Amino acid sequence: MADMTKEEFSQSIRTYTLNMYRLAFSILRNEPDAEDAVSEAVLRAYEKLGSLHRAENFKGWILKITANEAKRIYRRNKWSSAVEWEENMSPAFYDEHHELWDAVMKLEQGHRDVIVLYYYEQCSLKKISKILGCREGTVKSRLYRAREQLRRMI
């Protein structure tokens, strides 16, 4: 178990908040829900801090919790009509790569997740497979297909 003080936990959360938000937003496509997912993930992570075995694994661990929270919120809200993501998107977040980000957000969920984790969060294939709970080969094929779709879109 990683012995982390409250201050170390807070600092680690501050370090990865934007990463957590981008991942949650890629799943939910809605700014308020993504913010809720991040908040819930922080609470859940603090409650389960004892399950973190090594502090070096914090990023992957917190992103896995964030993905799970975002998916839980998505399932909860699935029945309601979705608000168009463009209406809720914070422009400062993607100014420079607007066209690419638009294309990424149009990908199906599985492809969007691997693109965000690989390119935006710079996670390894192995780490992505752990976060998403699938095999590394599946991650590779999703990444390949997502790139092909993006090439056709742009």
Predicted regions and their residues:
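Internal acidic/polar
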Residues: R72, W79-M105, S124-K126
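Short, small-hydrophobic-rich alpha-helical interface motif
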Residues: M20, A24, A34-A45, I65, ...
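A short pre-motif secondary-structure segment
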Residues: V114-Y118
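Sigma70-family region 2
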Residues: A2-D3, E40-N57, R76-K78
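Amphipathic, Lys/Arg- and hydrophobic-enriched alpha-helical face
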Residues: I13-E31, K48, M153
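DNA-recognition helix of helix-turn-helix
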Residues: L132-I154
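Arg/Lys-rich amphipathic alpha helix in sigma70-family domain 2
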Residues: G50-H53, K64-V83, R145
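A short, charge-rich alpha-helical start-of-domain segment used by transcription regulators
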Residues: M1-R22, R112
